[in-house]
Amino acid sequence: MKLNKVLIINEGYSDNLGDQAINDSLQYLLKSNSIENIEFQDFTKNIDAPIEISTGSNTSNKSPLMIQFFKKIIPSKIRWLIKNINRIIKASKDNYDLVIIGGGQLILSNATFSIAMFSWVFFLRLFGNKNIILFAVGSGTKFSFIDTLLYRKTLKKISKIYARDEKSKEILKNTFNIDSEFVYDVAFIHNKITN
């Protein structure tokens, strides 16, 4: 099947150089296989460019009192969903031949990753984008009840899962009853494409 339009979703706009390298490497791999129509969306952040890496000291990061109040009463997953749902729906309405989520350590029990994975997969499939793969993803080891529930529901809806290490494959099988295949971490080719 010829892939005319591919959507990549990962943490490519984070301030982590490894995440940026993963995104660059994945785009390079697709382009080197004659796939030119590539769109990108950040997995968890509603931004249009990579976060600049700060080298100075952080001055004041104090939020106004009203924001602090809402952060305390609204659960983090709901806050994330409110901030990102419009972006996810808009991107999901386009038609893609393939959606690649990954690489990186995206199967984690934290404030945003499980709800991000659930939201992306739910809305992509709702709008007809069912050819979704997780590529070169890593997994954490411990999951909260809600994160386990969200990942179990979501991972079953993904066409193919490629884990970047054997431990992640084992966790996917034992925790979520999901089979996956091994693939090398795509970030390792970054040095070859930058030289």
Annotate the PLM regions:
Residues 144-195:
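A nucleotide-sugar donor-handling region in carbohydrate enzymes
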